[in-house]
Amino acid sequence: MVYAVVRAGGRQEKVEVGTIVTMDRVKDGENGTIELAAVLLVDGDKITSDAKSLSKVTVTATVLEDLRGPKIVIQKFKNKTGYKKRQGHRQELTRVKIIGIK
């Protein structure tokens, strides 16, 4: 069983071939191919965390779709002054499928 821990959108994700990961928006758009930086590689009993060895490892993923996350609401309120502020935000996300760990 081969799996890797990759840096995806500012976070670390444990992935195997065939895993679908949702991460922050990637510029390549839909149906593009991207490479993710490996932080750790596990191949059976062999664990690789050395940066020199990991520079040779490539984790390839294909972009499935671009989507937006759930809406969150930010509110500010100051007592006795009538000050109210309301703002919403939806994070832009990309869903990718891991197609290879080499």
UniProtKB/Swiss-Prot annotation:
Species this chain originates from: Leifsonia xyli subsp. xyli (strain CTCB07)
Entries under PROSITE patterns matching the protein: RIBOSOMAL_L21
UniProt KW RNA-binding keyword: yes
Family annotation (NCBIfam families): L21 (TIGR00061)
Residue ranges the record marks as coiled coil: none
Cellular component per GO, a single term: ribosome
Family indicated by similarity: Belongs to the bacterial ribosomal protein bL21 family.
Pfam families according to UniProt: Ribosomal_L21p
Single GO BP term: translation
Protein name: Large ribosomal subunit protein bL21
InterPro entries in UniProt: bL21-like, bL21-like_sf, Ribosomal_bL21, Ribosomal_bL21_CS
Role noted for this protein: This protein binds to 23S rRNA in the presence of protein L20.
Subunit structure: Part of the 50S ribosomal subunit. Contacts protein L20.
GO molecular function: rRNA binding; structural constituent of ribosome
Keywords on record: Ribonucleoprotein, Ribosomal protein, RNA-binding, rRNA-binding
